Amino acid sequence: MKVIEVSNLKKEFISKKRVVNANGKKSLFKTEKVVKTAVDNISFSVEEGEALAFIGPNGAGKSTTIKMLTGILYPTGGDVKVLGLNPSKDRIKLSYKIGSVFGQKEQLWVHLSAYENFKFFGSIYDIKKDELENRINELAGIFEIKEFIHQPVKSLSLGQRMKCEMVASLLHNPKMLFFDEPTIGLDPIAKETLRKLIKKINKELGTTIFFTSHDVGDIEEVCKRVIIINNGKIVLDDSMKNLKYHHLNKKIVEVNLKNKVDIKETEGIKIIKAKDTLYKIEVDMNKTSMDELMGLFKADDLQDITISSTPLEDIIKDIYRGKDE
């Protein structure tokens, strides 16, 4: 069953700017209309229980799309249905069926405890007292927050707060959760914990996940399908498996050695930068392995190493390059 159906969705923002006269100066009175197309006739659908990554660079149209899907913004054109409802016309009804977690926007009252927040949200969603207590207890166990559930939110670490944000969004048992940069600012351990929890609610509770993030690790770990949007248009809609093979197969390895060495490029190993004992290397995991790379160095010569995924912006460039070829 399709829980999201989007057809030719468009959003334009209209502003005004002062007209420049023949002498090169801006007029004090004359203005002209400026139309900025944030989302440009996109179409896609999402099946119930899917974990979808909706990603793109800053200003690509991600947040605008999410705001239209959740009823915050009215579309300029096109059709959108979420759980059979028109988000902009049926926003209140839809709010009982969806939840949202935003990494940079708190929904919890920081001076209250997490438990007090949950009671408050339960009353908003008209959840019966006994049912709410059972739900809080169940989710507190899943997310392992019982230890600090009665502490003021302002005293919690960012990782603990994000767990509580997720519990608050799940209290009314939504059919779908929207995540916008939920792991931003988290340390690696907290990120991994949150990723596992998102996968767990998708698998065990059957909650549909609509996920945006700039962290490639997030989407690799959580999602099975990816839509990439850029300049308001969808440039890719594919499985995570295919995206990994064609675009996430490259890793960036930065090493710091005790002594300068002569590293020779091989198939799958490309030197991006070499300065003194610092090396930045691109490794194509489809053609070689980390073991082969590490074989180029002596173990006791290695001082430091970091491994990262290809930046999202580079992935989008690769996609465009492939379309042009």
Question: Where are the language model's segments positioned?
Answer:
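ABC transporter nucleotide-binding domain
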Residues: 195-284
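Conserved ABC ATPase "signature" region
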Residues: 20-27, 119, 123, 130-148
